[in-house]
A protein has these predicted regions:
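Extreme N-terminal starter segment of soluble prokaryotic enzymes
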Residues: 3-9
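Short polar catalytic/cofactor-binding loops
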Residues: 12-17
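Cys-nucleophile CN-hydrolase/nitrilase-fold catalytic domain and related Cys-dependent amidase chemistry
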Residues: 19, 27-105, 173-201
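Short amphipathic alpha-helices and their capping/turn segments at secondary-structure boundaries
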Residues: 24-38, 153-162
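Short beta->alpha transition motifs characteristic of CBS
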Residues: 49, 56, 100, 112-118, ...
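CN hydrolase (nitrilase-like) catalytic-core segments centered on the catalytic cysteine
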Residues: 63-83, 150-242
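Active-site catalytic loop in hydrolytic enzyme cores
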Residues: 90-170, 176-189, 245, 252-265
Length: 277
């Protein structure tokens, strides 16, 4: 593999109610990504707790610390970097929705906090404007979390100034049910516009299912890779759990892709065809 090629694993993992199960899924995906030669495993928003009505039960410091330790240990054991979503805890019981960058030695390099919260999230979490650009694997990585894609006026000036090579977009996104359907969905079109304006690639890492309202799962998943030109390079399967291992050249053009479906528990199937069906 050329030194200019970055092999990423986009981990569109099935969301579970229990943090232990989500963490097992994350660690299994990290192991798979390493086995396939990926440099980094990318995981969704609140990877370890999930996004559901039991979040208050899961978002406990001792539990989250243990789950995050397990992910860091998996990175160190398999010599692979990862980005993972987990709450962070501040003074006075303050909680943030955060995204953590971990290197191939298991060290925590940086943490990004979500600023643009939904109304339900704001009843439990606190917004925080911590959005560093992280140098890792020869690239500069930016982050926006889930519905922050709607905050274009705040994001675009920052990304233009910070000039990240890639922006990670972990979330639990789906089309607005009250609006006409578009192809690609409106939230993806907004990301394409942001990529063009800021000359950055964007990698979406989306949950493929919804737990509070299972009927919404039909429109979940479909994570995307968007090039600096705004071109939609790759779309993962709709409403399917699995891991996509993708080679990107220095110009953010996919050179190779493979799909591994997630089966029962934390098991993944063999390499499947691309594009996956």
């Amino acid at each position: 593999m050329s030194a200019d090629v970055l092999r990423i694993a986009v981990c569109q993992l099935r969301m579970e109610w229990e943090g232990d199960a989500n963490t097992a899924n994350a660690c299994a995906a990290i192991a798979l990504a390493a086995r396939e030669g990926a440099h980094i495993a990318l995981l969704p928003e609140l990877t370890l707790t999930g996004i559901h009505r039991r979040i208050r039960e899961m978002a406990v410091p001792q539990r989250v610390d243990g789950w995050l330790h397990a992910v860091r240990a998996a990175c160190a054991a398999h010599r692979i970097a990862a980005c993972v979503g987990a709450p962070t805890f501040g003074d006075g019981g303050v909680l943030h929705i955060s995204y953590h960058f971990i290197d191939a030695g298991g060290a925590l390099l940086a943490t990004v906090h979500k600023h643009g919260l939904t109304a339900p999230e704001a009843t439990f979490f606190t917004a925080a404007d911590l959005r560093p650009v992280v140098p890792l694997l020869g690239r500069r990585w930016g982050t926006m979390i889930c519905r922050e894609i709607d905050d274009h006026e705040q994001l675009a000036p920052r990304f233009r100034a910070d000039r990240p090579d890639l922006v990670l977009w972990p979330g639990g996104m789906r089309p607005d049910p009250d609006k006409p359907r578009t192809d690609p969905p409106e939230h993806v079109q907004r990301a394409q516009a942001l990529a063009r304006e800021c000359n950055t690639a964007i990698v979406m890492i989306n949950w493929p299912n919804a737990l509070n309202r299972p009927e919404e799962s039909a429109e979940c998943g479909a994570s995307v890779v968007i090039g600096r030109s705004g071109a939609l390079r790759i779309t993962l399967p709709l409403a399917q759990a699995g891991v996509a291992v993708i080679d990107l050249d220095d110009g953010d053009v996919p050179l190779r892709a493979a799909w591994f479906s997630q089966g029962e528990a934390a098991a993944f199937g063999p390499r499947g065809p691309w594009p996956p069906c």
